[in-house]
């Protein structure tokens, strides 16, 4: 699904295999699963779910039963869907003296940044770039060092992009390690049975 489209629920049920009054329960079950995430526990975005089959029992079917079944079915489908991790990208404007421009651009590139352009301003330059947010969390002291205290920057959220495989793998590994550590601290242990 294209970036920024949110959530789309498509009802392709024919023949009444799921009664119409339970379709909203199916959608709610899927929607309730989105915030929990699948990869590293981050919320899922830009998801299209198509319901095309199901079953119904006169006595045992209920709103809650359809919500639970939809959530479980959605999680099972996610294993085959190849979800990806998106990382936030910020738009950055860095003001620096002319003589520091090359070092600032080199530093932005080393942070996986994309330089979009430059504008002259007084005795310096304003460099416009897009950089993964994780790469500029502690940017101020580095910029001060590069520019001998004569540089400044502004940033704001721009959009999300697919995280490169090594970054995504690192995020997943760190999240799983943190979950295991939290489980060990609480003394709880999860077991799977077949």
Q: What are these language model-derived features?
A:
Residues 1-194:
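Accessory interaction regions appended to the cores of large information-processing enzymes
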